[in-house]
């Protein structure tokens, strides 16, 4: 009897040991999987850092050309450069929060400054936009504003390598930006003087899509259906924008966009924002 009891005890211990080994193996697999996802997130974030650096580098180069046109009193050239140069900045807007006070210095609208009772501090691209498109003149004030804009663009470019960009900021920033496009930018408030809003919209969508593209391999492992849904909605938004392309590789004036198409675009961006907001699943 004692021998049987000993045998049963040994068997129980052996089974328990095997169970512990299986548990350790499962924990090890989970840990390796988590480490793999973290590595992929880190790689995607690093790639986005590079993308942002490239956009801000081109933004600075374009701003230098834009300011030179202002200095030369070349209004036609300044107007030609204005929407195209701004696209580099607008592609980076999902992480504009990381730009600190340089964002309002470069991109603030007069309405925002008035709301904050800071209109005397207004500077940046939109102030020069007003001079070019509404006041239709380049004077000493415009040239002074252009020099300040260039100074701020250089500072932002220098700051690019130190920006604190993390997956959460990228994901939330892209959702917030598209929500802004669908609810306020769609009214034409962003480019109120030049009506070059479609350039901004395209760049905003491209900036958000870059984030999706970088995280797509991770998302497809977690939720393939969600990934496909996001891609489908990006395609719909881009198709609507393509409708207003001009023959020079740019976009028509926003004034030419019908109310029906403005609503269709806002609806499409909202439809994109809903699944895009679920992309945070990749960090879980």
UniProtKB/Swiss-Prot annotation:
Q: How does it sit in the membrane?
A: Lipid-anchor
Q: Which InterPro entries match?
A: EfeM/EfeO_iron_uptake (IPR050894), Imelysin-like (IPR018976), Imelysin-like_EfeO/Algp7 (IPR034981), Imelysin_sf (IPR038352), Iron_uptake_EfeM/EfeO (IPR053377)
Give UniProt keywords alphabetically. Answer: Cell membrane, Lipoprotein, Membrane, Palmitate, Signal
Q: Where is the lipid attached (S-diacylglycerol cysteine)?
A: 18
Domain of life (superkingdom): Bacteria
Q: Determine if Cell wall biogenesis/degradation is one of this entry's keywords.
A: no
From the UniProt annotation, give the residues forming the signal peptide: 1-17
Q: Which cysteines are joined by disulfide bonds?
A: none
Q: Where are the membrane-spanning stretches?
A: none
Residues annotated for lipidation of the kind N-palmitoyl cysteine are 18
Where found? Cell membrane
* One of the record's GO cellular component terms: plasma membrane
- Identify the Pfam families for this entry: Peptidase_M75 (PF09375)
Q: Which family does it belong to?
A: Belongs to the EfeM/EfeO family.
Spell out the protein name for this chain. Answer: Efem/EfeO family lipoprotein
In which organism is this protein found?
Staphylococcus aureus (strain USA300)
């Amino acid at each position: 009897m004692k021998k049987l009891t000993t045998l049963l005890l040994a068997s129980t211990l052996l089974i328990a040991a095997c169970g512990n080994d299986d548990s350790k193996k499962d924990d090890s697999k989970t840990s390796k999987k988590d480490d793999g996802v973290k590595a992929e997130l880190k790689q995607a974030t690093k790639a986005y850092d590079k993308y942002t650096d490239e956009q801000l580098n081109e933004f600075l180069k374009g701003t230098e050309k834009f300011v030179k046109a202002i200095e030369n009193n070349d209004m036609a050239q300044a107007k030609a450069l204005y929407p195209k140069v701004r696209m580099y900045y607008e592609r980076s807007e999902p992480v504009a929060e990381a730009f600190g006070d340089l964002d309002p210095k470069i991109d603030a609208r007069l309405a925002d400054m008035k709301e904050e009772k800071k209109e005397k501090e207004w500077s940046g691209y939109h102030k020069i936009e007003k001079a070019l498109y509404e006041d239709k003149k380049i004077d000493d004030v415009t040239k002074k504003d252009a020099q300040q804009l260039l100074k701020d663009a250089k500072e932002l470019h220098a700051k690019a390598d130190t920006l604190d960009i993390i997956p959460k900021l990228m994901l939330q920033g892209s959702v917030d930006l598209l929500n802004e496009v669908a609810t306020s930018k769609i009214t034409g408030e962003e480019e109120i003087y030049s009506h070059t809003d479609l350039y901004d919209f395209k760049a905003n969508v491209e900036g958000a899509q870059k984030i999706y593209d970088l995280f797509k391999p991770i998302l497809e492992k977690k939720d393939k259906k969600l990934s496909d849904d996001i891609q489908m909605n990006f395609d719909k938004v881009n198709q609507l924008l393509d409708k207003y392309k001009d023959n020079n590789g740019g976009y028509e004036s926003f004034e030419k966009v019908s109310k029906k198409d403005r609503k269709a675009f806002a609806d499409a961006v909202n439809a994109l924002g809903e699944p895009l907001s679920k992309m945070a699943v990749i960090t879980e």
